[in-house]
């Protein structure tokens, strides 16, 4: 592949320290795919609100990612950006906000993520109106689905097209839905849509069982992993920390130790982008070698860690992999 201007800039200038780690990790990702490997990307933090879809969607379309694990927030916030982008409010001076300023944002139905405020009415409620119908229809038909499957349904139905406010090619969730990309969403309950779903259960309008659970995500992943880990194996590209990464990486030791599948391959590539510093008792800040003791990575697994802001690093790495 002929590399474009962004890749050439990275190759020329990123020679040392975290910059060099970025290049090494990107080249490792590229080599893993070239040798026939598959890749899981995990999304923590507010990557969807950071509009990672501008590069991640193309990664999905070009087959550079085979499965995604993400938080419930990332699952919904990409779609919220798709349907309410013009209503978002940026607050560059967020460090100077007083408690009263924050209260004023709440009174105006804005929920702040660092310098970006998500508009409650246009984002959350607009989506709620349509997703409830899909939840209810499934329940009435005796059907049960995973959280991401419901989101795929609403995107592919075309019902949200009337609200699109960005170029749909920049929505990674739309790209994933169009490819029916495998996905796990651990801890989905900890999200706006999860809270809304719970409210309908409390009101007696929906049954909790209509939504497939986290345990069912793990049992599904326990089937997917052995079917896809032959040859070069499956790599693990972790953006941020938290449950989006901690949950799926455990499928390997679970299969090995609890299912006694002693020939199950370890993850065959590992990279984490995180600004969580190595500290006492922190899983997100742990160095990759610690994962060897948990039966997640092999001694010989290529391991990379880029200790930097993922909103800066991930698009650059994706640009390299895409040849931009």
Residues of each region from the PLM?
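N-terminal glycine-rich anion-binding loop in soluble enzyme alpha/beta folds
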Residues: 1-33
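C-terminal functional extensions of proteins
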Residues: 17-20, 243, 250, 257-324
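Glycine-rich phosphate/diphosphate-binding loops that line cofactor/substrate pockets in enzymes
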Residues: 25-39, 175-179, 223-233
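Glycine-rich anion-binding loop/nest that anchors nucleotide
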Residues: 39-48, 68, 184-188, 206-283
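Short acidic, glycine/serine/threonine-rich loops at helix termini
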Residues: 51-54, 79-85, 195-199, 248-252, ...
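A glycine- and small-aliphatic-rich helix-loop capping segment at beta-alpha/alpha-beta transitions
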Residues: 55-65, 82-93, 201, 252-261, ...
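A generic, well-ordered mixed alpha/beta core segment in the N-terminal half of proteins
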Residues: 60-127
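Ligand-binding beta-strand-loop-alpha-helix segment within the catalytic cores
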Residues: 101-192
């Amino acid at each position: 592949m002929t590399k474009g201007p962004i890749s050439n800039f990275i190759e020329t200038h990123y020679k040392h320290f975290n910059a060099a780690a970025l290049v090494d990790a990107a080249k490792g990702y590229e080599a893993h795919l070239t040798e026939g490997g598959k890749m899981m990307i995990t999304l923590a933090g507010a990557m969807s609100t950071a509009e990672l879809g501008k590069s991640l969607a193309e990664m999905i379309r070009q087959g550079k990612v085979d499965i995604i694990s993400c938080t419930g927030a990332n699952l919904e916030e990409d779609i919220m950006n798709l349907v309410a982008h013009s209503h978002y409010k940026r607050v560059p001076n967020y460090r100077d906000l007083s408690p009263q300023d924050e209260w004023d944002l709440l009174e105006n139905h804005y929920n702040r993520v660092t310098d970006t405020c998500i508009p409650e009415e246009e984002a959350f409620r607009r989506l709620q109106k349509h997703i409830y119908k899909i939840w209810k229809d499934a329940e009435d038909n005796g059907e049960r689905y995973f959280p991401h499957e419901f989101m795929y349904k609403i995107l592919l139905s075309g019902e949200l097209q009337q609200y699109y406010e960005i170029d749909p090619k920049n929505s990674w969730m739309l790209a994933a839905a169009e490819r029916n990309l495998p996905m796990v969403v651990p801890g989905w309950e900890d999200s706006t849509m999860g809270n809304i779903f719970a409210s309908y259960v409390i009101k007696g309008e929906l049954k909790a069982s209509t939504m497939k659970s986290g345990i069912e995500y793990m049992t599904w992943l326990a089937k997917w992993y052995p079917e896809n880990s032959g040859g070069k194996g499956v790599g693990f590209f972790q953006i941020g920390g938290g449950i989006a990464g901690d949950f799926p990486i455990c499928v390997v030791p679970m299969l090995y130790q609890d299912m006694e599948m002693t020939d199950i391959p370890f993850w065959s590539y590992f990279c984490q982008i995180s600004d969580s510093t190595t500290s006492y008792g922190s899983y997100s800040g742990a160095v990759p070698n610690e994962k060897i003791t948990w039966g997640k990575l092999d001694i010989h697994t290529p391991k990379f860690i880029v200790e930097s802001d993922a909103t800066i690093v991930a698009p650059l790495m994706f640009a390299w992999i895409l040849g931009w």
